[in-house]
Design a protein with these regions (language model features):
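M16 family metallopeptidases and their MPP-like homologs
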Residues: 15-17, 23-43, 60-116, 152-175, ...
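Active-site SXXK
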Residues: 44-50
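Acidic/histidine-enriched alpha-helical segments
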Residues: 64, 120-144
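N- or domain-start disorder-to-order transition segments that initiate the globular core
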Residues: 1-24
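Active-site glycine-rich loop that binds ribose-phosphate moieties when present
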Residues: 182-189
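Short, polar/flexible loop-turn hinges at active-site or ligand-entry regions and domain interfaces
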Residues: 53-56, 98-101, 120-129
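Glycine-rich, mobile lid/loop segments that gate access to catalytic sites or pores
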Residues: 140, 148, 159
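Residue-level detector of conserved catalytic or cofactor/ligand-binding positions
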Residues: 192-200
Length: 200
């Protein structure tokens, strides 16, 4: 199979980078958006909430069991900053199909599970579960506060905030504590709808 990049929907790209020297398959699903002070905390919180459960696997225990059936597949969340863009999403990995017992296919069900997290997250009353949003919001705020404890990261962030105060580049990849504190399950769900409609 050759390396390729193809637009599968408007603003949605599939990039394939085959590498036979590895014994694992890796799948990355990323949302790339302009870094924006008002939306950065929402974007940073979104993958953490989506990774808490799907309608089929509504909690971490059920998700963990589903991953265990795929030989210990792992799915982690990512929140990165690349210039004036914010990249958030998931990275999943599993044993490459070539090494699975009995030739079992693992990549497709792993991709389906990531697809469920993105497209069929657990909801109640048309919104994300309040419990999940509040729990992950606390984690996000803790991560924002923890930057102060690392002198190098804190100095770098403050430098960018001062030098690039009026530019997207000055915004932290995690957003700010004040905005994060105001997020609710309703506002996060509405943000996700706007976020995905921008891509369409």
């Amino acid at each position: 199979m050759m390396e390729f990049r193809r637009e599968i929907m408007r603003h949605v790209y599939l990039t394939v980078l085959p590498a036979s020297k590895f014994k694992t398959s890796c799948l990355s699903a990323q949302f790339v958006t302009e870094l924006d002070r008002e939306r950065a905390a929402y974007n940073a919180l979104l993958p953490a909430v989506l990774s808490r459960g799907t309608m089929r696997c509504p909690d971490m225990e059920a998700l963990s069991a589903a991953m265990d059936t795929l030989y210990g597949t792992t799915v982690t969340t990512t929140v990165r900053k690349n210039g004036e863009r914010q990249c958030v999403g998931f990275v999943a990995s599993c044993i490459d199909d070539r090494f699975a017992l009995g030739g079992e296919k693992l990549l497709e069900p792993m991709a389906a599970l990531v697809g469920e997290m993105l497209l069929d997250p657990v909801t109640q009353g048309g919104h994300y579960l309040r419990e999940y949003v509040e729990s992950e919001k606390v984690n996000l705020i803790d991560s924002i506060r923890a930057i102060r404890n690392d002198k190098r990261d804190w100095a770098n962030l403050r430098l960018l905030q001062e030098m690039c105060a009026a530019e997207p580049y000055g915004v932290s990849r995690l957003g700010d504590e004040e905005t994060a504190g105001k997020i609710t399950n309703h506002t996060l769900f509405r943000h996700c709808l706007l976020y995905t409609s921008d891509a369409a």
